[in-house]
């Protein structure tokens, strides 16, 4: 069976060998591996516990907790599929994992971040409705489930270009490379199926939809809630002397 290898060479051609771009000290590698591994394990265990509590307790079955469970699920996904693999690739400067994961891991990372941000936005809107219109009809559990499904669908669509773009290619080990050093190539995960201009537009679109738009919505609704609560007085007659005795 013939194997086709894509080699991307953006280096200086020279007959001399060279070291890699940078070498990570073993101690730093071990320390960061422990830290990232701990973060990943805690993220999975902690958020799994949150989901388990919400699922097993009927009184926890409400719209807000559904959103919280969805937020926890997104954190579990990023803890399982993004943190460990993206970390090792960044440190080792090569892709030692199965090639399909080159597209899968960045896709999952963007997917999880999108779900988290959109869910936080949904929670903010739900709290805004509860505080500013407390007597209005509360969204049903079915509505919350539909919103959550929509969040995952939109997040998946926005993450798809990254899966399309990323592929494993062979690149030189060092900055200086000679055509005779064919054995000194390494696998590297890189965006090759989409042009640099397309990736720039995609990054700008993500920044707008993933950061600026949710931030604006959350800022506006929480500002309105703060103003509403700040101007409200507690029920009952205020008595300064009585209230001072409770302080």
Label each region the model flagged.
Residues 1-6, 69-79, 170-181:
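Alpha-helical transmembrane segments of integral membrane proteins, especially early/N-terminal helices
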Residues 25-37, 60-125, 129-144:
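Extracellular TM2-ECL1-early TM3 structural module of rhodopsin-like
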Residues 44-55, 76, 83, 111-134, ...:
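Cytoplasm-facing ends of alpha-helical transmembrane segments in multi-pass membrane proteins
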Residues 68-72, 152, 207:
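Transmembrane helix-bundle signature of multi-pass membrane transporters/permeases
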């Amino acid at each position: 069976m013939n194997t086709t290898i894509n080699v991307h060479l953006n280096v200086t051609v020279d007959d001399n060998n060279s070291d890699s771009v940078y070498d990570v000290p073993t101690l730093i590698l071990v320390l960061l591996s422990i830290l990232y591994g701990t973060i990943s394990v805690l993220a999975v265990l902690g958020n799994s516990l949150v989901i388990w509590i919400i699922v097993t307790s009927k009184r926890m079955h409400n719209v807000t907790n559904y959103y919280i469970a969805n937020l926890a699920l997104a954190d579990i996904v990023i803890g399982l599929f993004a943190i460990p693999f993206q970390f090792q690739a960044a440190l080792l400067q090569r892709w030692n994992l199965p090639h399909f994961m080159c597209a899968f891991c960045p896709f999952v990372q963007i997917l999880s971040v999108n779900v988290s941000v959109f869910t936080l936005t949904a929670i903010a809107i739900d709290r805004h409705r509860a505080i500013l219109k407390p007597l209005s009809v509360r969204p049903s559990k079915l509505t919350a489930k539909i919103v959550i499904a929509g969040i995952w669908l939109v997040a998946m669509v926005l993450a798809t270009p990254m899966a399309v773009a990323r592929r494993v290619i062979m690149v030189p080990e060092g900055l200086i490379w000679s055509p005779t050093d064919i054995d000194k190539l390494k696998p590297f995960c890189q965006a090759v199926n989409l042009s640099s201009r397309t990736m720039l537009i995609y990054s700008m679109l993500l920044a707008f939809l993933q950061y600026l738009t949710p931030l604006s919505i959350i800022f506006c609704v929480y500002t309105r809630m703060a103003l509403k609560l700040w101007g409200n007085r507690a029920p009952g007659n205020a008595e300064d002397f009585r209230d001072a005795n409770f302080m």
